[in-house]
């Protein structure tokens, strides 16, 4: 791909084409990805988001990677849906330390009718603060999707996790077609899609390519594409899975950037295991979004002040959100992050 073709958005990628991207020399792949990235984004800006678990544990799904599944004994305590006021307090705290998007995740197969009114109030409250809103609640029906859109939800996260061919080896309680149907409902309701997957579950190169093909060949590319590295949790079937080669993970980010030029490619779960050099390579490969705070959904996430120190060393600045002048936004982050204290409510995006 030449620089002259970086504006092309495609929805017809083939396995042969994507496999060829994966296997080309590493430097060539990163050069191509960086060229595409610079055609669509400021290469020195990264979106920062905070993720809060609003309902933790006892999920009826059997996703083999997930510590929140009720099928496995991981020691995670079940928690009820958080009160709306507590969620809004955490959102205000996230905004104060620089997050421009607040994501709320619940360990559900799908939201119940009795929980929806509370969820809708959370969306309205966070929107009123001037933040972007994102939720991951499991499978949605059309009525629920339209209600969330009416409440003002900006983004809905629903990961495809892996390729259709490998999916049945990881999850049996929800079909791939159900996941695609939820994404269709979200798209039709006018919300933006956040969807990605996980590396390190025993998948092949073709499975990694197949996941990205599914995402890139959707009618519209996801606005955000979280790429997770498996966080191995004791008690889950994948606790002894083989580690992902760091260069293979960077290749995944780079190919995602090439296939979906205008999407935010999110460096998500597993970042705690990445050293600074690997994270810097990830940004060079086209990753331009991170979750930060103390934790994602159930696993450790690098401390936010460390993130900002790394940003400073790399000359990277957070994307400014609505209502934040760049200077004010940056100052708020740097001031508050040094004083940020641990919060047990921040939890791994891979389980979304």
Curated annotation (Swiss-Prot):
SUPFAM superfamilies: Radical SAM enzymes. Pfam families: BATS (PF06968), Radical_SAM (PF04055). It catalyses: (4R,5S)-dethiobiotin + (sulfur carrier)-SH + 2 reduced [2Fe-2S]-[ferredoxin] + 2 S-adenosyl-L-methionine = (sulfur carrier)-H + biotin + 2 5'-deoxyadenosine + 2 L-methionine + 2 oxidized [2Fe-2S]-[ferredoxin]. Its cofactor is [4Fe-4S] cluster; [2Fe-2S] cluster. InterPro entries: Aldolase_TIM (IPR013785), BATS_dom (IPR010722), Biotin_synth/BioAB (IPR002684), Biotin_synthase (IPR024177), Elp3/MiaA/NifB-like_rSAM (IPR006638), rSAM (IPR007197). Pathway: Cofactor biosynthesis; biotin biosynthesis; biotin from 7,8-diaminononanoate: step 2/2. Transmembrane segments: none annotated. Catalyzes the conversion of dethiobiotin (DTB) to biotin by the insertion of a sulfur atom into dethiobiotin via a radical-based mechanism. This is Biotin synthase. It comes from Pseudomonas savastanoi pv. phaseolicola (strain 1448A / Race 6).
